[in-house]
Design a protein with these regions (language model features):
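Structural register within alpha-helical repeat arrays
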Residues: 94, 126-127, 131, 161, ...
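Residue at a conserved register position within TPR or TPR-like alpha-solenoid repeats
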Residues: 98, 131, 165-166
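Short coil turns that delineate tetratricopeptide repeat
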Residues: 118-119, 152
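Structural motif corresponding to the intra-repeat A-B loop/turn of tetratricopeptide repeats
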Residues: 101, 134, 168-169
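Metal-dependent phosphoesterase core characteristic of DEDDh/y 3'-5' exonuclease domains
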Residues: 1-66
Length: 178
């Protein structure tokens, strides 16, 4: 579930297996026993040795395993073809996974492709970090100036431009303009 949460948490907020089944895989369980009841059924079996109610536990566990297999394939596909993501939150999140792994080329493609909303500002910040790490100062400046021109990113682009001009380009006078 950890890998699924890294991809889907930004969009879904809650990422229990049942949430992922329903909202990512489109699976809705019928006549399923809630996982919270399983320990009590197990304790009852230990006391009575009546295994009749354990069948529902086995069925529940089988569904869990099957869902995890389908979810694993879905996550694999999301990483293999990140640009096929329907939701910008998922595309941004896949970019973060690649960013964390040092695969800046793929992360950059994901971040650049994020088109709207809150994720666009987060993608701009993440792209700035990649450009700084890879010493692409001109790209960072262009991105940050674009963020300022479009009035996105709040104070972030101003602070980052000031840092670039003061520390990297050694132009403290220019840094003060931001």
């Amino acid at each position: 579930l950890h890998a699924a949460r890294r991809v889907y948490k930004l969009r879904l907020k809650r990422c229990s297996l049942s949430d992922l089944e329903e909202r990512v895989l489109g699976i809705r369980r019928e006549d399923d026993i809630p996982g919270s009841e399983i320990p009590a059924l197990w304790q009852e079996f230990l006391k009575t040795k009546n295994d009749e109610k354990l069948l529902s536990v086995f069925d529940h566990n089988l569904q869990d395993v099957q869902s995890m297999a389908v979810l694993l394939r879905t996550i694999y596909d999301a990483h293999q073809e990140p640009m096929q993501q329907v939701y910008m939150e998922d595309l941004f999140s896949v970019g973060k996974v690649y960013d964390s792994a040092g695969r800046y080329d793929i992360a950059e493609r994901c971040y650049v492709s994020v088109e709207n909303g809150v994720c666009r500002g987060m993608a701009g910040r993440a792209l700035t970090r990649i450009y700084r790490r890879t010493e692409r100062t001109a790209d960072a400046i262009a991105l940050l100036e674009g963020m300022i021109a479009s009035n996105s990113g709040g104070i972030f682009p101003y602070v980052e431009l000031a840092k670039i001009y003061e520390h990297r380009l050694r132009q403290p006078e220019k840094a003060l303009t931001y």
